Amino acid sequence: MSKKIAVILSGCGVYDGAEIHESVITLLRLDQRGAQVQCFAPNIAQLHVINHLTGEEMPESRNVLVESARIARGNIKDIRDADVDDFDALIVPGGFGSAKNLSNFAIEGAGCTVQPDVLALTEAFAEAGKPVGLMCISPALAAKIYGPGVNCTIGNDAETAAAMNKMGATHTDCAVTEIVEDRARKLVSTPAYMLAQSISEAASGINKMVDRVLELTHEDDA
């Protein structure tokens, strides 16, 4: 029986939303493995809009749900409509949107908070003991979701790892091709573009993470 996976997107574009390569690799791997997928995003304004050609901020406003719909080809719902009981697992691609829209980690660091609708859903998965996959900068939110002692990775960036540890997480350095698993919490993380120098490098770890998340959903079948 195919598993149902929720995917949270944070906009469209690495500098102000979801990392597009990471999101597409995730959706492709889930489809290749026969999973049913539903994308969600918060219906809120982005922190800001970045010109991805120049890296400069643009004087306009964009909506996270509307922008995320670009990646999901329109098949996306407001995160407030998500019910943990409808899904077997959750995956959150990275990109600065995770640190700017799903949370304010990019601004506040260790003193960050998670957007309330995002926190409600991710905490529901944690409390239900359902598998969760986080990649790139998204694991920076793990301590806010799971509490102290959660084991995860963003690769090997010392400053980010220090902020995560300050929040109560236990950061484990990890190669781009590998994953870190907190077995007690069924949380799987991988560095993706925190380390990847190419789309294929990013895919190596993301595919491994997706595969492991799906394996964990089948453990509940036993």
Residue ranges of predicted features:
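Glycine/small-residue-rich loop that forms an oxyanion/phosphate-binding "nest" at active or ligand-binding sites
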Residues: 59-75, 80-85
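Active-site-adjacent pocket-lining segments in enzyme domains
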Residues: 6-20, 24-38, 75-222
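N-terminal beta-loop-helix "entrance" segment that forms/cooperates
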Residues: 40-65
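A short, charged/proline- and glycine-enriched loop
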Residues: 1-3
